[in-house]
Protein backbone atom coordinates (compact mmCIF):
# COMPACT_ATOMS: atom_id res chain seq x y z
CA UNK A 1 0.00 0.00 0.00
CA UNK A 2 1.10 3.50 -0.74
CA UNK A 3 1.89 5.89 2.03
CA UNK A 4 -0.67 8.57 2.74
CA UNK A 5 1.88 11.28 2.02
CA UNK A 6 2.46 9.89 -1.49
CA UNK A 7 -1.28 9.81 -2.18
CA UNK A 8 -1.59 13.45 -1.10
CA UNK A 9 1.44 14.39 -3.19
CA UNK A 10 -0.11 12.74 -6.26
CA UNK A 11 -3.43 14.52 -5.70
CA UNK A 12 -1.75 17.92 -6.01
CA UNK A 13 -1.43 19.44 -9.47
CA UNK A 14 2.01 18.87 -10.98
CA UNK A 15 3.99 21.94 -11.98
CA UNK A 16 5.02 20.26 -15.23
CA UNK A 17 2.95 17.76 -17.23
CA UNK A 18 5.76 15.22 -17.45
CA UNK A 19 5.85 14.90 -13.67
CA UNK A 20 2.26 13.64 -13.51
CA UNK A 21 1.86 9.87 -13.23
CA UNK A 22 -1.01 7.46 -12.81
CA UNK A 23 -1.71 5.85 -9.47
CA UNK A 24 -4.19 3.11 -8.63
CA UNK A 25 -7.43 4.55 -7.24
CA UNK A 26 -7.96 1.53 -5.04
CA UNK A 27 -4.58 0.82 -3.43
CA UNK A 28 -2.34 3.71 -4.55
CA UNK A 29 0.19 1.58 -6.47
CA UNK A 30 2.13 3.74 -8.98
CA UNK A 31 3.17 0.96 -11.41
CA UNK A 32 1.19 -1.19 -13.87
CA UNK A 33 -1.95 0.98 -13.80
CA UNK A 34 -4.54 0.43 -16.55
CA UNK A 35 -5.71 3.83 -17.77
CA UNK A 36 -9.10 2.54 -18.89
CA UNK A 37 -10.00 1.34 -15.40
CA UNK A 38 -7.73 3.52 -13.26
CA UNK A 39 -6.59 0.56 -11.16
CA UNK A 40 -3.40 -1.51 -11.01
CA UNK A 41 -3.05 -5.00 -12.44
CA UNK A 42 -3.27 -6.62 -9.01
CA UNK A 43 -6.54 -4.90 -8.10
CA UNK A 44 -7.85 -5.54 -11.62
CA UNK A 45 -7.16 -9.26 -11.28
CA UNK A 46 -8.78 -9.44 -7.84
CA UNK A 47 -11.90 -7.54 -8.93
CA UNK A 48 -12.20 -9.48 -12.19
CA UNK A 49 -12.05 -12.86 -10.42
CA UNK A 50 -14.73 -11.73 -7.97
CA UNK A 51 -16.95 -10.50 -10.81
CA UNK A 52 -16.90 -6.90 -9.58
CA UNK A 53 -15.92 -5.47 -12.98
CA UNK A 54 -18.89 -5.62 -15.37
CA UNK A 55 -18.06 -6.89 -18.85
CA UNK A 56 -14.73 -8.40 -17.82
CA UNK A 57 -14.27 -12.16 -17.84
CA UNK A 58 -11.36 -14.56 -17.91
CA UNK A 59 -10.41 -15.53 -21.44
CA UNK A 60 -9.57 -19.05 -22.49
CA UNK A 61 -8.64 -20.49 -25.85
Curated annotation (Swiss-Prot):
GO terms for molecular function: rRNA binding; structural constituent of ribosome; zinc ion binding. One of its GO terms (biological process) is translation. Its cofactor is Zn(2+). The keyword Hydrolase does not apply. Pfam families: Ribosomal_S14. Keywords: Metal-binding, Ribonucleoprotein, Ribosomal protein, RNA-binding, rRNA-binding, Zinc. It comes from the Bacteria. Zn(2+) binds at residues 24, 27, 40, 43. Binds 1 zinc ion per subunit. InterPro entries: Ribosomal_uS14 (IPR001209), Ribosomal_uS14_bact (IPR023053), Ribosomal_uS14_CS (IPR018271), Ribosomal_uS14_sf (IPR043140). GO terms for cellular component: cytoplasm; small ribosomal subunit. The keyword NAD does not apply. Part of the 30S ribosomal subunit. Contacts proteins S3 and S10. Belongs to the universal ribosomal protein uS14 family. Zinc-binding uS14 subfamily. PANTHER family: 30S RIBOSOMAL PROTEIN S14, SMALL RIBOSOMAL SUBUNIT PROTEIN US14M. NCBIfam families: PRK08061.1. Binds 16S rRNA, required for the assembly of 30S particles and may also be responsible for determining the conformation of the 16S rRNA at the A site. This is Small ribosomal subunit protein uS14. It comes from Mycoplasmoides gallisepticum (strain R(low / passage 15 / clone 2)). The gene is rpsZ.
